[in-house]
Amino acid sequence: MVKAYLDNVRKYIPHYWPMTTFVHHNPLHGFEDMPFKEALKQASKLYKAKVYMDPDYYVELYKEGIIKRDILEKNLFEFLKSIGLQMYFAESKKFITEISQDWKYYKVKSSTTPDINLIDYFNQKIVKDEDTLFQELIEDMMLSEILDAILEDNTTDIIEKEILEFVARFLDEGQTTMSMPEREKGMFGAFKLYEGLNTSLNEEEYADTILHELSPKNVERYILNHLLKDFGWAAFIKYREDNEDYYFQQIHPASLLEYLAVRLHYEKKYLNHYPISNFVELQKAFEQNKTLFVLKLLKAKNILPSKYIDRLEEKDSPKAILSDYLSEEVFLEAYRIQNIANELLLHLDKQKDITDFAFLIEKLKEEEGYIWLKSLEDSYIKEYTIDFLQSNEKIQRDILASAVFCIDVRSEAIRRHIERLGNYNTYGVAGFFGTPIAFIEFDKGHEQYLCPALIKPQKIIFELPEDEHHDYKTKHNINYTFKKTLESLKNNPYTPFFMVEAMGWLFGVNLFGKTLFPDFTLKILSFIKAKKPKTRFTIDKLSQEEIEFYAQKFFIQKIQEAYHQEFKKHINDKKAKDLFEAIINENHKGIDERILEILKTKYNINKESFELEKIRLSNVGYTEEEQIKLVENFLKLIGLTENIPKFVLLIAHGSTSDNNPFESALDCGACGGNNGLPNVRILASIANRNQIRKGLEKVGIKIPEDTIFIPGIHNTTTDEITFYDTEVMPQKDRALFDKIVKDFKIASQKTREERAKTLPYAGSGDRIPVRAIDWSETRPEWGLSKNMGVYVGKRSSTQNIALKNRFFMQSYTWEIDKDNKILKNILSGPFIIGEWINMEHYFSTTDNERLGAGSKVYHNVVAKVGVWTGNYGDLRTGLPYQTVYHDGVPYHEPIRLLTFIEAPAEKVLEAAQEVKEALKLVVNEWVRLIIIDKLKGVAYTFKDGNLEVLVDSRGINQFVI
């Protein structure tokens, strides 16, 4: 039964990715099956979080003219009409624009006695019997929390500390110097050893037993209460459970069910110290002390005013205290409405009854956040829809270079500056460039998924060095040693005494230089930093002979590593190969049984693993047909299928920042929180092959013989662009390319100067590269903050419109998308990822403490998977305060993703019908979809699940949202 309950509530656990591959996500992803407004209402209650900004935030935008008066009035009137109170329009407008932000100040006694009808109205809402109050108050609490409130204890803190200490140690990915033993047995198996539990029960049986002993009335809700207590850790465990190929999940498996069993164990363990140890006993105790229990819970939840707490401590009658408290609440709420009515209503009559007015104000307080939000969105939609609809296509000739960037909002400025410098045009595409790969970097031993989190790549690509790299190895080893030393300094209480003395000068450069003298330090570190050798990729598919050879070599190296780790011995290739063949052929004669057991079980040296590795290696690289299709799909995706210029520049992006656990959040979201350089190097290499171009001609795409594809990387922190693999370029083209490089450097500088104006304390654009290595810098760049929309269409439709680095820009030419395949791919990929990014920024802004990550200043890295605040606590989900706020003022403007698609309406609808996940987001209004149909001169939007005309430029431009 426990597993069934768990399956029902797991959707309420937010998404989470480890910080090394940070993926932006909607923390309310589990609510997306519901309409946006209803989902926010439920989530606010469940997470105890704010889901809209405070009224004064929106009022300020209204005063600044950002929220348009006519749009606010229209949305307000529609709401009032829906509840039959449109006669209060003038009063309602004044309430939300002038009074609501001071709501709490109206809850005071005044000279005007509240109307008796108001007293009755609030009496019915506030005064409840003790049984009802008790059940409402404990609904979201664990039993230990309830008892802490009643007995004024802190046992829950002790329980949580025990839970978190175990969980952080079990889930550790190499941070601690003392690894927990027996983790390969799984979380619950390791926990039984950790706690010395003598039980044969599995995690489900164990959790079921404890829940039976606790006997909560609503078992499903009680399980959810436990998981939401530390929902960051629950989210990470959910991530691991959902990603079975995650390396640490394979070697140290964990599940939400095991985590629940651990949590319940500690709660039950400490409840044994109480006279009450289950809900049956709690109910019996409540029957004897109903009023006192209710008061203690009100106090624990910070609801009971201090004067009543004083009376409680003075042993006043609990019944008198509760009666007085509820009575005062009734009168104060009545006074509040009376005070507001005195300001808004000149006289009361039958049409404007005071209880109707109270109901109106109650509904306005419930709805005002959404009214303001929609009005803000509609104001932007009106502005941009008319601009996009009326923009004219510019025909550019004699293009020297087409630069393809990620759709990321941070690409908009540099694209704009490049286009202004000469014969350049730019395109936007998801940053993995249509090349999803599992990438194994040179000098690294693990895969990186360089593709959106929605995709599991089918192709594996290895990076291999092309030449000698002794200098790289030497410098890399120095840097690696220093990095490990620094980790020891953070994580080991003893080794720093020895290491700092031995390497003091090197620590001085980092610990002080990066904080006090970042400019000078940047020069030193650029000299020390290991320069990666020239590398190539395993682009072509391996033959069967190659697969056999590499698989065998891999296992031989595993055997050598095992001997080194387990027995401190070195064995040569021949001996390791003989041992490997003996194990695979099951000829164990003469092999020490202990060695055989270790190799087979701990290191998976067996026939089954060998065959699996060969299957895995069969996924390395692409066939020629696959390579042709890869380039064809890419060129069609961006609409570059004819008039292909001399240079096609494929520019991925990444970021650089030091002392920043959230660094991967600044990298490419479409590459799983990594940078996309390998993707563009692979794609460019394939596109430059003659046989691939011949294959493309057969599908109608002619790439001129002298066209060169050059890969590059855009560092979004410094706005520098670096090109790679330029040796493929003939000498005769060097001068032209040098001009491009020079122009791009100018564009980079102009972009830095533009960004410096928005970055606090940045000074000039020249200072921006220094911020990337400054350890005291909590905000190396704004990242994706202020994102507001995505434009799917031609660059000519946006080129002359001020997008202010707030739009994702996906190139799309609907005329060549005959079967809707391209649009469906956009809707199933960039569209959904864009919503994740947008919603994470939205909720990290509305409630940074609950749905964001809090301030970076107090963060500490834990287990190499995330951060917590202070010395222990929950894993922080969402984005840090410094990403979305500055000096207490929101920098990010939380609105839903405004998605503009330039295509005929019927084409968009047809594609959306086939992408159910995207359709759900549109119909449930998690995004705002606007269709720009330039053929008809009409823009459409969705309203209440139906398509409606938004602007019709054939007649009078009328905005009908």
UniProtKB/Swiss-Prot annotation:
It is a peripheral membrane protein. It comes from the Bacteria. Its cofactor is Zn(2+). Its main location: membrane. Part of an energy-coupled inorganic carbon pump. Forms a complex with DabB. This is Probable inorganic carbon transporter subunit DabA. The lineage of its organism: Bacteria, Pseudomonadati, Aquificota, Aquificia, Aquificales. The gene is dabA.
